[in-house]
Amino acid sequence: MKLWKTASRFLPLSFLTLFLTGCLGEENLTALDPKGPQAQWIYDNMILSIIVMALVSIVVFAIFFIILAKYRRKPGDDEIPKQVHGNTALEITWTVIPIILLVILAVPTITGTFMFADKDPDPEVGDNTVYIKVTGHQFWWQFDYENEGFTAGQDVYIPVGEKVIFELHAQDVLHSFWVPALGGKIDTVPGITNHMWLEADEPGVFKGKCAELCGPSHALMDFKLIALERDEYDAWVEGMSAEVEEPTETLANQGRQVFEENSCIGCHAVGGTGTAAGPAFTNFGEREVIAGYLENNDENLEAWIRDPQSLKQGNVMPAYPDMSEEDMEALIAYLRSLKVME
Amino acid sequence: MATQKQEKSVIWDWLTTVDHKKIAIMYLIAGTLFFVKAGVMALFMRIQLMYPEMNFLSGQTFNEFITMHGTIMLFLAATPLLFAFMNYVIPLQIGARDVAFPFVNALGFWIFFFGGLLLSLSWFFGGGPDAGWTAYVPLSSRDYGGLGIDFYVLGLQVSGIGTLISAINFLVTIVNMRAPGMTMMRLPLFVWTSFISSTLILFAFTPLAAGLALLMLDRLFEAQYFIPSMGGNVVLWQHIFWIFGHPEVYILVLPAFGIISEVIPAFSRKRLFGYTAMVFATMIIAFLGFMVWAHHMFTVGMGPVANSIFAVATMTIAVPTGIKIFNWLFTMWGGKITFNTAMLFASSFVPTFVLGGVTGVMLAMAPVDYLYHDTYFVVAHFHYIIVGGIVLSLFAGLFYWYPKMFGHMLNETLGKLFFWVFYIGFHLTFFVQHLLGLMGMPRRVYTYLGDQGLDAFNFISTIGTFFMSAGVILLVINVIYSAFKGERVTVADPWDARTLEWATPTPVPEYNFAQTPQVRSLDPLFYEKIHGDGTMKPAEPVTDIHMPNGSILPFIMSIGLFFAGFGLIMLNMDNPIINPWIVAIGGLALTFGCMFVRSIKEDHGYHIPAEQVKADLAELKKGGN
Ligand code: HEM
Ligand SMILES: [Cu+2]
């Protein structure tokens, strides 16, 4: 009874149990619902470490609550408790047991570190292993498929069930490339080339984030990783590598002129490899979001073109506040027509 | 040589004081002001994150707030608050009349203070630094970082000098000024941990000073140490920073351990369990603290060999830390525990710190850290260490030493209320952040989109912050209330404590001990209570006591350094009103001029005559002290 009374004072702590109730967050963002072998490995070892650490914590908490319950000084009790110096046997025990626990964690730590650093091609697909060069910019992502000869901006496509190798670069400041549901993150560092690999078990859209402070709009530096079955992926690659055709619609055709006259094209390539100044637009019409985070509708698109700074503080795109309504309409129609998949 | 101090105005007295007890109180006040400032910033940041896509702070302002919050909390709040206790308590606990170099002690305070002021001035010159408290290049380089970073670089450079010379002072004091019989293995644990922490400052603040100097050269004079396009190396900064930055955590947490190791025995009425093991565990923690800096950099691409080595090295720190945890628990075990406010904070520290520690081991698993790194999981981890460890023990120390420092108690009812509100708020704020991190929330983000599963926990976290703020307000009310209505303390030893500071009368006379005490054991006061008459045996007859004179020079020298730093910052301003070099060189000239004056001016201090000391003693006897 007494014990319970004491314990109940610590009731706030019992929301520890929240941890076990499965509030997992959004599918395809959270790392608590892994969707690839690397993420699964991380998840399993995280659980292993939580179990070990929970054991340690439970021992400490148990001793602590016993103390709370048993060793309170009663009013008027002036007795001086026995003054103990220490206890060598006990002290050796709580030195040796943690060492054993740490060894249990150290072994997967080392094997995992080497496994993740492996940048050899996928043995299953050999020469067809997908290599993607990632470049972090303030505040967007560029994906160069160098072997295939084209560039994608903001959305990166990979085939399902294959180890995909990423080569990481940074254009300006540090960024960090992270797709939580698929695995860990590695920084993109100016002047240094890093590598990592990821694999997706199933098709889907996985959210990616920049994890290293990179300026005022760091929070908005999101991207999408889209995993497709191999044949769909091949179709996408083909579409991205194809010559860009004239838009068939007149409005869109007009829009293309606007795009060229306002030198949008100076920063945003359509087809082929992009310049480094802005995201490539080859498949813009298929994007779910603008600028990494805004829903891709006409209203947002117009707002973005007229004043990108107010939507993403500190980015380098110039504003076009005075573009006429007709031009804007045509431009949007043109951007909508940029698709590579049927 | 004068025999009597002249009367001075109160302000002049504080500006010129070299008394360690007054300097301690100045550290306490300055540290508290900075703590509140950084706390308000935290509150604002949490309000911004209460709902998705809030528009309370802009991305730029938010980044300035994280930078200033982190920098201020570590350098200008936690450090000076610990220094406050170290300054007050160390000389008393070792039976000394003052620190080894009272003048340097005052200098250390004023340099720290003006350095902090310089940093804070950034708000008036176009915004605070915005590259995080770690100031990673290139974001903090000339090309990407604004003027605020110059304030960061020079403000920290100046205040770091203050911290460094104070640490040297503590080292010399502890080595040289101990009372007869106070051997190293009888030092109270707070003195031990302060000693080791000061050693860490010596070895960690020097690389920081070097790093800041290099960054300053890059920013002001277009050197290229950290600019990759010019052959510099970005990662170099991270190594230099963390060689300082990792030990910095131990610099703060070791004295916090020391406070806990004082408060728990006092209120359990037991000696510290495993004293020797505690001392050596502290040393091992400090040593390992220097070996593991690169665990902050698992994701920069150091390669698997380096990552494995640093991962395993990091894990080993858990062993000595575990020893400490169990020794604290077994100090309480079998004791007769009084749960007043100080003890509530000290005892609740133990399980809370364990929660922060176990996530530390989790983070040390490098490949799993690829997930945790730079997410809210890390934010949760280090706030469990910093708030759950350092801040809880600061509060424990405050309630414990307050009667000695200010001559009255803090109100216990308000104190306990404060404890519960703050403690609940703390867990509410930071526990859910572990989950936010795993659910994909990076740290240092000023906003997040709705419907990503992050909304609920962010909301809970912000509510927790309101509780913590309410707690701190309760503390402020307590301090004000107790100043007027609090129970006066004139007895030497209101807690029935064990160490030497409680052998001095309250209020503590300027000379601390009328006669240097003879120390016969660990926990000397307790020993005398059991084996003697409960008072310390004097180790010397009553004689004239030699005291140092106050001096305004430390204050002026610090102003000199302030202007030296400000002048250099002006080099990067668009339209400085006067030539920056005049300000910079003028400031340095002021400082060096003062040093020259100090060197040639003869100042032998003054004596308190033996008769007066005797009179004081007689007065105390009458008061039944
Ligand atoms: C009153 C309770 C506190 C609250 C609510 C709080 C809140 C926050 C928040 C919201 C952040 C930004 C997190 C991010 O990186 O996205 C932060 C960062 C930080 N806090 Fe606290 N904090 C508190 C107390 C402290 C204390 C007492 C210290 C140190 C003594 C501290 C040290 C830091 C540091 C070093 C950072 C990292 C700053 C950076 O990223 O550059 N905090 N805190
Ligand atoms: Cu970024």
Swiss-Prot record, chain A:
Tagged with keyword RNA-binding: no
Binding sites annotated in the UniProt record for Cu cation: H175, C210, C214, H218
Key words of the record: Cell membrane, Copper, Electron transport, Heme, Iron, Lipoprotein, Membrane, Metal-binding, Palmitate, Respiratory chain, Signal, Translocase, Transmembrane, Transmembrane helix, Transport
GO cellular component, one term: plasma membrane
GO BP terms, alphabetized: ATP synthesis coupled electron transport
GO terms, molecular function: copper ion binding; cytochrome-c oxidase activity; heme binding
Signal peptide start and end residues: 1-22
Side Cytoplasmic, residues: 70-89
Lipidation (N-palmitoyl cysteine): C23
Region (Cytochrome c oxidase subunit II): 23-249
Subcellular location: Cell membrane
Membrane disposition: Multi-pass membrane protein
Domain of life: Bacteria
Cofactor annotation: Cu cation; heme c
Pfam families: COX2, COX2_TM, Cytochrom_C
Top EC group: translocase
Positions of S-diacylglycerol cysteine lipidation: C23
Major subcellular site: membrane
Listed EC numbers: 7.1.1.9
UniProt-annotated binding residues for heme c: C264, C267, H268, M317
PANTHER family: CYTOCHROME C OXIDASE SUBUNIT 2, CYTOCHROME C OXIDASE, SUBUNIT II
Family: Belongs to the cytochrome c oxidase subunit 2 family.
NCBIfam families to which the protein is assigned, alphabetical: CoxB
Protein name, as recorded: Cytochrome c oxidase subunit 2
Organism: Alkalihalophilus pseudofirmus (strain ATCC BAA-2126 / JCM 17055 / OF4)
Swiss-Prot record, chain B:
Binding annotation for Fe(II)-heme a: H69, H383
Record lineage: Bacteria, Bacillati, Bacillota, Bacilli, Bacillales
GO biological process per UniProt: electron transport coupled proton transport; oxidative phosphorylation; respiratory electron transport chain
Keywords: Cell membrane, Copper, Electron transport, Heme, Iron, Membrane, Metal-binding, Respiratory chain, Translocase, Transmembrane, Transmembrane helix, Transport
Cross-link (1'-histidyl-3'-tyrosine (His-Tyr)): H246-Y250
Induction text: Elevated expression at high pH.
Protein localization: Cell membrane
Protein name: Cytochrome c oxidase subunit 1
Pfam families listed in its UniProt record: COX1
Chief location of this protein within or outside the cell: membrane
Record: residues binding heme a3: H381
Family the entry assigns: Belongs to the heme-copper respiratory oxidase family.
GO cellular component: plasma membrane
Function field: Cytochrome c oxidase is the component of the respiratory chain that catalyzes the reduction of oxygen to water. Subunits 1-3 form the functional core of the enzyme complex. CO I is the catalytic subunit of the enzyme. Electrons originating in cytochrome c are transferred via the copper A center of subunit 2 and heme A of subunit 1 to the bimetallic center formed by heme A3 and copper B.
Gene Ontology MF terms: cytochrome-c oxidase activity; heme binding; metal ion binding
Record field: catalytic activity: 4 Fe(II)-[cytochrome c] + O2 + 8 H(+)(in) = 4 Fe(III)-[cytochrome c] + 2 H2O + 4 H(+)(out)
Positions with a binding annotation for Cu cation: H246, Y250, H295, H296
Transmembrane segments: 23-43, 72-92, 99-119, 151-171, 195-215, 240-260, 272-292, 309-329, 343-363, 382-402, 417-437, 460-480, 551-571, 577-597
Hydrolase keyword on record: no
EC number: 7.1.1.9
Record flagged with keyword Cell membrane: yes
Species in which this protein is naturally found: Alkalihalophilus pseudofirmus (strain ATCC BAA-2126 / JCM 17055 / OF4)
Membrane topology: Multi-pass membrane protein
Recorded name of the encoding gene: ctaD
Pathway participation: Energy metabolism; oxidative phosphorylation
